[in-house]
């Protein structure tokens, strides 16, 4: 069985517009149309059995609507093969209430994205969210490292992760993009071997640049990718694509 642990979908009404914005920022080609149906089609084409959708809450007021969609997607899992995590924003003061709702709805975890939520990962608000999520037994996935759509400031660095690990001691923290996108030397030196998981999303292979786009970034080399796996342990690495 193949599980893609890191995917994204958008409501049909806004999928095209959202994907257009992401493409304009990243200068890369999408692999699907960003809809749930598009994800399911790509799963069939590539032989993926289960996909986990990781919603990103970019403003506090979005949390109720986004989590309602997550519940609906997850309720249809048997027929779709798609499971959704919940979302939360550091600006949500009622974070315990939100996390309790996510837990009671049967969702298995949450996604945090410090870049799109404009907060540093070692912010006390994230620490509180992660601490309570850990109490509830929820998985916490966080975008780690550079985001090519918002590259000017990195909101989740290996040093910030070390601080959270030392202070909060989360049991099920997953660092997307092999621990820190484009910061893999630091990840190797500071995070490999720590009590944390990493996913492979958008970390190995070739970037599908738009025609004429400046090739500013590269994914991890095969040598670095294997170094990270060997140093951290394959049992702590989760497969993910970052679809679309």
What are these regions (language model features)?
Residues 47-62, 69-89, 111:
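Short, well-structured secondary-structure segments
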Residues 32-33, 57-61, 90-93, 105-189:
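Divalent metal-binding pocket/active-site signature
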Residues 181-244:
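H/E-rich (His + Asp/Glu) clusters that bind or coordinate divalent metals
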Residues 13-18, 64-66, 98, 152-154, ...:
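Short aromatic-enriched loop/helix-cap "lid" or pocket-rim segments at secondary-structure transitions
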Residues 40-47, 67-81, 97-107, 127-136, ...:
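Acidic (Asp/Glu)-rich catalytic clusters
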Residues 33-37, 64-71, 158:
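Short, surface-exposed alpha-helical segments at coil->helix boundaries
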Residues 3-7, 50-54, 82-86, 108-112, ...:
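Hydrophobic faces of well-ordered beta-strands that scaffold small-molecule active sites
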Residues 1-61:
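An N-terminally biased module of ancient metal coordination in phosphate/nucleic-acid-related enzymes
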